Amino acid sequence: MRLWPLSNDIKSKQFIKIFKRSDGEYESMIQRVYAGLRKLECGADITIATSKSQVSLIHNQLGCDVSVCVEPCRRDTFPAIVLATAYLHDVKGIAEDEVAVVCPVDPYVESDYFDALEKLGALAAAGGANLVLMGIEPTYPSEKYGYIIPTGREPVSGAEAFKEKPDAETAREYIKNGALWNGGVFAYKLGYVLSKAHELIDFEGYEDLYEKYGELEKISFDYAVVEKESRIQVMRFAGQWKDLGTWNTLTEAMGECFVGPAMLDETCSNVHVVNELDVPIVCMGLKDAVVSASPQGILVSDKERSGYIKPYVEKTDRKVMFAEKSWGDYKVIDVGQDSLTIKVTLKPGQKMNYHSHSRRDEVWTVIHGEGRVVIDGEARLVGVGDVVNMPAGCKHTIEALTELNVIEVQLGKDIDVRDKVKSKGGSDEEA
Amino acid sequence: MRLWPLSNDIKSKQFIKIFKRSDGEYESMIQRVYAGLRKLECGADITIATSKSQVSLIHNQLGCDVSVCVEPCRRDTFPAIVLATAYLHDVKGIAEDEVAVVCPVDPYVESDYFDALEKLGALAAAGGANLVLMGIEPTYPSEKYGYIIPTGREPVSGAEAFKEKPDAETAREYIKNGALWNGGVFAYKLGYVLSKAHELIDFEGYEDLYEKYGELEKISFDYAVVEKESRIQVMRFAGQWKDLGTWNTLTEAMGECFVGPAMLDETCSNVHVVNELDVPIVCMGLKDAVVSASPQGILVSDKERSGYIKPYVEKTDRKVMFAEKSWGDYKVIDVGQDSLTIKVTLKPGQKMNYHSHSRRDEVWTVIHGEGRVVIDGEARLVGVGDVVNMPAGCKHTIEALTELNVIEVQLGKDIDVRDKVKSKGGSDEEA
């Protein structure tokens, strides 16, 4: 929400495409991290632990063959890491003495970070400790992070204590004495976490744990495991590691001053523009400002002030105005009294689930590409200019034979994304 | 163009709805002036002289029964005033000894201005001069205006000389000596301008003049008439009279700090927002700034800098993204590779011209209201959810029985507003 209007209730900051790749395309934080991990020489096997609501987005941005461990609901980090570890062992068949390295995709990092992850894994494999933590060299006395107090200043040391979110004064003291940020990056052998899990949770294996997931206690991995473990190592990391949680920090990491159609006059200074609309943004005479536009809204803010956006976003209409799905994406282009018009883009070869709506009619007009629709069991090919009528209750799906753009008009009272009934059939295989 | 993105190639500043009426609705400059004139006790008969491209907009904003004298092409002010005067005399049958008062709709004025217009007309009727000019008390030594040097400082005097756009130094000198701005506001008896016209132009009456209009010399009324006339009076006017030609001056005249969906945090100061999009604009920590959004684009500018917008607007895509027509309005909601999707709003009882396109297909989906379409001569009623297909060449029109909203998908290569063929028929009477 703090990166509104680019983030909304279903798209969080990890998915905002804001970083320019060498080929000129833009990528998101999760795409950067995934690409960085895939380049590692050790050929790490990557699994993404995430909540249900993010799976479509992950498939959209990383491809449909990425390995995903889905949390059926939100618990805390201990249940999440146990579930992912059980998934690696029971579903992917990875042995108990193999090493897992856990890293969040939130922080902005560079290539040295991935090398450090590899070292972290090697330390865990060597078996000198049950848990190997990455300790990040602090760049300022943050009040938001947890601190690790290491036993010494050598590259790899033990951990003496863990301190949660101190005030700035205390943080400054910690840092003077060599304390490190706890970034939630650590490595362990699967067997270690599985045995800890069985001590604390009564479960058989992955399937059983998944079933019980909603009943598990909300408890952090730090609290349940890290702070109680004596066989622990801390590896110092001094490279780039930056939380891009606010517009102010996010724009610092942007390579150029704008993404999307924008013009800044020569009297603008320290201005960043991220424009996901098709219309141009013209900026003149601005200082220290961020300007961002999406189908969700438009933000114009002094960079320092941008951290205080939350109460204003809460006052806006929170209806989701754009989303990335596994099959492509959509954006709302008109909100009427009893209608909603959206532009749908399907990637070649992708298709929607076969579904129906109980309280709204829909009309598709194909504006680009070729596809195949199934309407109440009847398949037919569609191309530019073809119109498909789907009254409420009518089961429908569309599959893109080439990249496909469709204008979808939704008609009805109280149109709601949750009015969706999945159906069986409609295609050769289930989407 | 200087008020981009609210103005575009077909909508000029006079039509931007930015002034809050007492009933809470917003009105444009032309609506303000028209309402002011209609309130005059003298019951002035109002005719609007304008170019062809503005007629739809005038009908949209002032109603379809407003009297309009259309210039078939752009000449200068002398031909325009002669044409309008001939229109009043020959078409509307107004006698030669009746008075016409000419006033531009550009400046921002208040009610005392309309009273002054009435006095100007009374002076012309009294016959003490052939021409009665309004001389506006300057508020600063502008380099953009023409100056009238009056023969004295009394409320009504003679004119000694006219000076075009002096430098600021000279303007300051003029003002010290009692000079006034020439705002192009003046009154005369129709017979006077008609006789001047016949001296300079060989024409029979209005119809003949209209036919010849394109061949007339481009010459200003000031140069052709005012500066050569010795029987002239100048009436001083000291009320509000402000050119709102830039964002900086326009926002000064706004009653509130925003129009349209917007939120400004408490750290904003001297910030104005005009938002014609449906999505909210959130402003935080801005100073002396103007923010404006329309389907044409988004402007974020320091107020002083906003006067330098022209070269940036010239670099944007100039395709017209919204327009007001006599029957309602439309806005572009999606631009595809070979498609354009627009939202059309028709006012109750209004209809489009019966027309066809030679190089594009169209699909209408009715999203609100009820109407009647005529497709290649066949009439039928349409309501919410009805879809109408119009391949290239198909003649079509739609009439609104209630307020009507339609999503129109245009499909074809090089879609252009000029691809429009008007047809006969299609309705009981021609639109």
Annotate the PLM regions.
Chain A
Residues M1-P5, V417:
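Short N-terminal binding/cap micro-motifs at the start of the first secondary-structure element
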Residues Y188-V388, C394-T397, I415, K420-E430:
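Left-handed beta-helix
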Residues C103, V366, V409:
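Catalytic metal- and UDP-sugar-binding loop of GT-A-like glycosyltransferases, i.e.
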Residues I407-I415:
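C-terminal structural segments of small proteins and small subunits
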Residues E110-L216, Q233:
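Conserved core of the sugar-phosphate nucleotidyltransferase
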Residues F15, I30, A84, D106, ...:
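Residue-level signal for inorganic ion chemistry
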Residues P5-D9, F19-P104, Y108-D115:
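Conserved N-terminal catalytic core of the sugar/cofactor nucleotidyltransferase
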Residues D45-T47, V101, V132-L133, Q233, ...:
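A structural signal for isolated positions on well-ordered beta-strands in alpha/beta enzyme cores
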